[in-house]
Amino acid sequence: MKFKVIALAALMGISGMAAQANELPDGPHIVTSGTASVDAVPDIATLAIEVNVAAKDAATAKKQADERVAQYISFLELNQIAKKDISSANLRTQPDYDYQDGKSILKGYRAVRTVEVTLRQLDKLNSLLDGALKAGLNEIRSVSLGVAQPDAYKDKARKAAIDNAIHQAQELANGFHRKLGPVYSVRYHVSNYQPSPMVRMMKADAAPVSAQETYEQAAIQFDDQVDVVFQLEPVDQQPAKTPAAQ
């Protein structure tokens, strides 16, 4: 896991962030914006694969689509993919028209069924995609990378953003010879984690690599931000020493 903290500008008094008037104290204060970014190596992939079958009637189209999906599910089970990681209930049938001379002519029906697979062993990715095509599933809709435990990375990013805000405030207070006071207000920016789409990429002049290596695995980034208003207090003055009696 790669970890980094990004510091944004922190301002004295009025900051660039859109703070409401009642979010700022009347007295001296500091506004800081703490941010952090945590990079995680993907450990799961979500596959969406579709079968699209045409036939003379809807029942036949559905039957053929079901047979192909059943064949692929058997393949997945042979590859130790748990049933809870397989979803195949999505099915739709629709009329299939041919258009000639501005007229629509019914030529049959189509059945479309989607299989979604959560893959927890990324080294099996290529074989699962090949298996889908061999089973007659004719469209790979998407392959997205993610992490199995995103909350753990979100918590790390949030804690780092809080630490970053406190560090900025403390440094500014010290620089202006003030004492950092209590927190007056906090504004938290809820960040959304999105799985990263995986793209098969291959340069023409690249050295030979295995088929599995042609699937790039970009890091998943978890960003967090928290804006904090701290009150400022004057540094305690040392009492003047009384001259010693002569």
Curated annotation (Swiss-Prot):
This is Uncharacterized protein YggE. It comes from Escherichia coli (strain K12). InterPro entries: 26kDa_periplasmic_antigen, SIMPL/DUF541. GO terms for biological process: cellular response to heat; cellular response to reactive oxygen species; DNA damage response. The lineage of its organism: Bacteria, Pseudomonadati, Pseudomonadota, Gammaproteobacteria, Enterobacterales. PANTHER family: PERIPLASMIC IMMUNOGENIC PROTEIN, SLR1258 PROTEIN. It holds the Pfam family SIMPL.
